[in-house]
Amino acid sequence: MKALKELLSELIFTCERGNLEKEVTAVVYDSRKIVEGCLFVCIKGANFDGHQAAAEAAEKKAAAIIVSQEVELPKQSETTLIRVEDTRYALAFVSAAWFDHPAKKLTTIGITGTKGKTTTTYLVKSILENAGRKVGLVGTIEIIIGDTHIHAVNTTPESYLLQEYFAKMVESGCDTVVMEVSSQALMLHRTQGFVFDFGIFTNLEPDHIGPNEHGSFEEYAHCKSLLFQQCRIGIANCDDVHWQLITKEHTCSLETYGMSKKADLRAQNLQFTNRQGHLGIAFDVTGLMNFHAEIAMPGRFSVYNALTAIAICRHFKVSEADICKALLAAKVKGRIEMVKVSNEFTLMIDYAHNTMALKSLLTTLKEYEHGRLVCVFGCGGNRSRERRFEMGEVSGNLADFTIITSDNPRFEEPEAIIEDIITGMKKTDGVYISIPDRKEAIAYAIDHGQPGDIIVLAGKGHEDYQEIKGVKYPMDERDLIADILKERGISF
């Protein structure tokens, strides 16, 4: 239990009814979880406004209710009514207080940007743990607390859940947390209630703009920029054309990284490395640090991811040797993830599931000396048809051979989605085949692999399911590959 006054101590509010001399048994923002003695925070969601449940909360003898608009409570109710300007903002501070401000007991690292967040969080975790720290992680794929892995629903959880995860990290002995910070999370105040020790900006491209996300690119950029008003040390990629827009209202100390001479920490002399089953890139780190490094992931964007991690970890006094060792060993599920299937060609799994990501990935891989570039992909159902045309055209232009298959068809027919992709493919001279069953498509790619080929399984990445007509059926591409190899008597 916590005193209501204590939970409200960092908020500006008006007590419209009742008194503050109460004990609270729980903090609740889901109307289905209202219990006697709780503090119910009315949140406006996509499908339901918690203010509609205010009277119900009072009837169930909630200790207090936080609202941002007028509500009617039963006249006889003794529930305290608190009014604030923004209930999501209030929830963040109340949650931090409820869990005894766990972020103050951790070194907190928040990474925002259109691309690179997931990979960079794992690189930072790898480097810091290699140097002896215990690091929690919050991101798109999962939440990691000690040995516990929790499947992620959102890139950045709701503020109450985030504070609960922080508390569990402290309890498990973590001293640091690295997390992805989405623009939606910043817009919805999920990361309020504490100050990041480090805030990092990777890059910005038009994405997440639409009816259910951001109304415009300007709004998207503004939301990203909020991180630099909520951290002590800001670190920004100054090669990105938008970096000054993102940092112009910063309230933190600021340093930069990139490949240009103006960066405080720089990567130079890039060298592509291509060994059997391995695509990577080596580079020299100069400026704030000076050493030679290599990352076991291909492409210039991998250098940016590595450089971001180095820019963060240098503040932890990690040795150059520990950084180099961790970068070579780092592996991120579903992010340019190499899977050994042959001694003659390379196969990888990647989450590239939209036009921008697929184009970036295939363009990167074309920079390496190789045989054919083979792309196996599909598109999700009940999503933009335009994306299907575009991705078909991208693969047709960049891949030497495309195998079009099913992704998450959802409530559409896989064959109809494939036909849309083929429409885009036919705008090019690209060679393709369509195989709707994803396992059969992967098997075809492996069976027809040629010496020097690079085969990319794009779109599913870290996902371990296939969504068909409202049901998520188990399907992990690593398991599919293992089954295919076993059926052929191949082992590594």
What are the roles of these predicted feature ranges?
Residues 14, 76-85, 150-153, 251-258:
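Active-site regions of enzymes building and remodeling cell-envelope glycoconjugates
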Residues 63-69, 234-238, 376-377, 400-408:
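Short internal beta-strands
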Residues 24, 37, 62, 78-79, ...:
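Short, well-ordered alpha-helix to beta-strand connector turns
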Residues 8, 91-238, 242-250, 307, ...:
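Phosphate-binding loop of NTP-binding sites
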Residues 1-15, 36-39, 251, 288, ...:
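ATP-dependent carboxylate-amine ligase
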Residues 45-47, 183-184, 205-208, 240-241, ...:
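Short glycine-rich anion-binding loops that position phosphate/pyrophosphate groups of nucleotides
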Residues 10, 58, 71-77, 172, ...:
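Acidic, Mg2+-coordinating active-site environments of NTP-dependent enzymes
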Residues 1-93, 229, 263, 268-270, ...:
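N-terminal leader/targeting and accessory segments in enzymes
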